[in-house]
From Swiss-Prot:
Residues 1-169, 200-232, 252-280 are annotated as: Disordered. Residues 113-122 have a biased composition (Low complexity). The lineage of its organism: Eukaryota, Metazoa, Ecdysozoa, Nematoda, Chromadorea. Residues 13-22, 68-85, 123-134, 142-157 have a biased composition (Polar residues). This is Uncharacterized protein C04E7.3. Residues 86-97, 202-211, 269-279 have a biased composition (Basic and acidic residues). Transmembrane segments: none annotated.
Length: 518
């Protein structure tokens, strides 16, 4: 007993339960030290464990000399505790969980076969193999909600704990219904495919028929052409046969057009009428110069209370054309017959001059001088026309004004004449504008602004064409004039600087001065 001195103060403790696993020994040399924190524990009650005393049933220590020791009490406590745990586990167990295989068994490796559990029952540890061997695979019915739990095989003595909500008959009927539905859907697919194939075949047959027909018609047309050319060998000459063929093709085209569009007949007739007209008479075309002239006359003549209007390009063009033709018809009346004669003579002179210049083979310096003299003559004519229109405007405007004095009547014509002749804007500022204070300035301003909006795009076009005309004459000096198109001729006719300079001066002057006074 030298190695194990039982008189030595020793205490065996466990974290979970006293007297069981994980024994720890606290030794102390003195008895005084041992009794400091554990005064209530008696000495020599528990001894060191004997390794031979351990058994698989539990921890049973060798009885000591002191009689009945606490080891027997510990064993009884352990047995009672384990029984209590087992009872609690059975009470808490859900009967539905018996269908689920044991988690510990599922985690075991698959090569382990039947094993003995603590209850003595035989349990198979591989649930996948069990399902493959015992359960037949069936399609899952759509009515069941959630995955189906695997059933656990039980012994004959133990009653079944599983409660199946769906019977086997219902499963069989559901699987049969699914099979029937699958067969029906397959049949429908087959029918759809057959219908599609039939439609495709019909389409191919139709396309082949149309191709055959088109070939036949082409062959017939060739035959007809050959007949037309071959039949009249004795009676008609070759030229006559070709002529006849052309007429036939014309008629055929016309018939095709009539078939394609029912309204094409009228168009065809209109085209024929127009072609006949153009053959007999020359189409009267009003030049761009007349268009400009009519615009200026409208600017001078109109005396309504105009509001400023924004014109788009297409509307402006339409308005221009309408005004041109209306003005032309007005000039042909009895009152303005002399003025119309002057304008028409101007136009004729210019056209004749340009026609001669285009086809002349002489030096261009002579032509250029002639053109300059003609422009001067036309300027004088234009000034006469504009002055006449300004006087008319003055009479109309100042008759409506409140009590116009003689001074106003005397000053205004000179003012208007000067305004139309002046080119420089600085000279315009020096002109007497005393009459503006006695005329309604808002009316004058509205009139000027509206007219400026109408005439501004036209003036920009005129400036561009003037530059083009100048470049044209500079490039062709000393050379023969080429055969220019009618467009360049029309642009040359626009070469009158006094027109748009006078208009810009008047409108800008009225705009600035009236805005200052307002």
């Amino acid at each position: 007993m030298s190695s194990h001195d039982f008189t030595h103060p020793v205490r065996y403790t466990n974290k979970n339960q006293p007297g069981r696993n994980s024994l720890s020994r606290h030794e102390s040399g003195d008895s005084s030290r041992s009794t400091q924190g554990h005064a209530s524990l008696p000495r020599n009650t528990v001894g060191p464990p004997d390794p031979n005393a351990l058994s698989p049933e539990g921890l049973v220590s060798r009885p000591l000399n002191t009689g009945v020791g606490p080891n027997q009490q510990v064993q009884e406590q352990y047995n009672a505790f384990s029984n209590q745990n087992e009872n609690d586990r059975k009470m808490m167990e859900d009967p539905r969980e018996s269908a689920v295989p044991n988690k510990r068994a599922a985690a075991a490796p698959p090569w382990i076969g039947y094993t003995q559990t603590y209850q003595g029952q035989q349990k198979y540890r591989n649930p996948q193999k069990l399902q493959q061997s015992t359960i037949k695979k069936r399609p899952k019915p759509e009515t069941t909600s959630g995955p189906k739990k695997a059933s656990k095989p039980t012994s004959l003595s133990e009653p079944k704990k599983t409660e199946c909500s769906i019977s086997e008959d219902e499963l069989l009927s559901a699987s049969l219904a699914e099979r029937v539905q699958a067969e029906v859907s397959e049949n429908e697919q087959i029918e759809n495919l057959t219908e599609w194939a039939q439609a495709y075949k019909q389409k191919q047959e139709k396309s082949s028929e149309t191709k055959r027909r088109s070939r036949k018609t082409a062959h017939r047309e060739e035959e007809q052409k050959s007949k037309i050319l071959t039949v009249p060998i004795g009676s008609l000459s070759e030229d006559q046969a070709v002529k006849q063929l052309k007429e036939l093709t014309k008629e055929r085209r016309r018939d095709d057009a009539l078939v394609a569009e029912p309204s094409a007949k009228k168009k065809w007739q209109q085209k024929e009428v127009e072609s006949k007209k153009n053959e007999g008479t020359s189409f009267e075309k009003v030049s761009d110069q007349v268009r400009l002239r009519t615009m200026i006359e409208d600017l001078v003549l109109q005396n309504e209370n105009l509001q400023p209007v924004e014109w788009s390009g297409s509307e402006m063009a339409l308005k221009r054309d309408n005004d041109r033709y209306q003005r032309r018809s007005q000039l042909k009346t009895a009152n303005n017959r002399e003025l119309a004669k002057k304008m028409m003579s101007m136009e004729r002179n210019e056209v004749d001059f340009l026609r001669n210049a285009r086809y002349s083979k002489h030096g261009n310096l002579k032509v250029w001088n002639q053109f300059k003299s003609l422009v001067k003559a036309n300027k004088l004519l234009e000034e006469e026309i504009i002055n006449q229109k300004c006087q008319e405007l003055h009479e109309i405007k100042f008759k409506t004004a409140a009590k116009p004095s003689l001074a106003i009547e005397k000053s205004t014509p000179t003012y208007l004449e000067n305004m139309l002749i002046v080119d420089d804007q600085e000279k315009v500022k020096n002109i007497d504008i005393s009459y503006l204070s006695k005329v309604n300035p808002s009316h004058h301003y509205q009139w000027g602004e509206a007219k400026w909006k109408k005439i501004e795009p036209l003036l920009a076009e005129l400036k561009e064409t003037e530059n083009e005309v100048n470049c044209y004459y500079e490039n062709t000096m000393g050379h023969d004039v080429p055969q220019t198109s009618l467009k360049t001729v029309d642009k040359i006719l626009w070469h009158f600087e006094h027109k748009y300079d006078a208009i810009t001066c008047t409108v800008r002057f009225c705009k600035n001065k009236c805005s200052e006074e307002i």
